[in-house]
Amino acid sequence: MRLIMNADDFGISKAINLGIIEGFKNGIVTSTTLMCNMETTEHAVNLAKENSKLGVGIHLVLTAGRPLSKNVKTLVDNEGNFLKYDKMVESACIEDIRIEFRNQFEKFLSFGIVPTHIDTHHHVHSIESVFEVVAELAKEHNIPIRHIKAIGEEKYENIKTTTEFIDSFYNLSMIEPQMLINLLDDNMNVDSLEIMCHPGYLDSKILSSSSYAYPRVKELETLTNKEVIQFINEKNIELINFKDI
């Protein structure tokens, strides 16, 4: 089995950025995805450049922070912040989404790095119209998209992706070391597997703005756990990133 352990939310805060790098240096994190509309995006970029073997994709955002684009009125509230998920689904115009996603992608490229792949914050590309915009970018740049089966396998025609994607490594009940070992053991026959994770340290930004806080620290502990690393080595699981699929 070839495993991509992808850490979402790179760029959301300095503490999260540093935690992701810890998971890469001393654990099994192989890949991350960068949020380009955050105050600490450039902090994450600098860390990525110092750790060039870490795969870095783009985490396209519609539901956190503020847009990079002007005049995308269907995406924002009265204060100029992105709408929450449900409101976004009701309000968002596809052309505004296209403008914003392209601006986020151009922002990523402006840092002088090439994204390994695309995924989205809160899996907004599981919405069919949003997926089409993401697919445009993926095809233009010949990069993979995170595999969301609910959108339909036919949507991934001519788009690179992993064989399987797992998002259940999440919440305290599911992120103990043995739970991750069991998850890996159950998928040993899969060719390429991406597991989503959210490791990190905590700071005031996360504590004040994220509903998912303490479990990030626990995830980091599990992703650097000696028993987990030993299991991966014993089972000859190949740790890769999206450049390898």
Swiss-Prot record:
Family annotation (CDD domains): YdjC_EF3048_like (cd10803)
Q: Which UniProt keywords apply?
A: Carbohydrate metabolism, Hydrolase, Magnesium, Metal-binding
Residue ranges annotated as coiled coil are none
Q: Name one GO biological process term.
A: polysaccharide catabolic process
Q: What is its EC number?
A: 3.5.1.-
Residues that bind Mg(2+) = H59, H121
GO MF term list:
deacetylase activity; hydrolase activity, acting on carbon-nitrogen (but not peptide) bonds, in linear amides; metal ion binding
User: What's its job?
Assistant: Probably catalyzes the deacetylation of acetylated carbohydrates an important step in the degradation of oligosaccharides.
What protein family does this chain belong to? Belongs to the YdjC deacetylase family.
NCBIfam families, A to Z: PRK02134.1 (NF002559)
Subunit composition and interactions: Homodimer.
Q: What is this protein called?
A: Carbohydrate deacetylase
Instruction: Provide the species name.
Output: Clostridium beijerinckii (strain ATCC 51743 / NCIMB 8052)
